[in-house]
Amino acid sequence: MDIKGLLVILFFVLLITGEVENMKPKKHKYKYKNRKRFLENFEEPLQKRDMNEESYELFNQ
């Protein structure tokens, strides 16, 4: 086998191993770090929804 054949085989081996590495599930190092900020982002829409429900109840009285 000549050098070009070996290089082609090496290329495909590296390509396949790279795809296998990408298929592994990644561990989330900072799983709960952004949770507080995530919850804070939802407080405002919830407050708006509560205000809309209150105004709807007042309107229907």
From Swiss-Prot:
GO CC aspect terms: extracellular region
Keywords from the UniProt entry: Secreted, Signal
Signal peptide region: 1-18
Protein name according to UniProt: Venom protein 22.1
Keyword Cell cycle: no
Family membership: Belongs to the non-disulfide-bridged peptide (NDBP) superfamily. Long chain multifunctional peptide (group 2) family.
Subcellular location, record wording: Secreted
Main location: secreted
Tissue and organ expression note: Expressed by the venom gland.
Originating organism: Lychas mucronatus
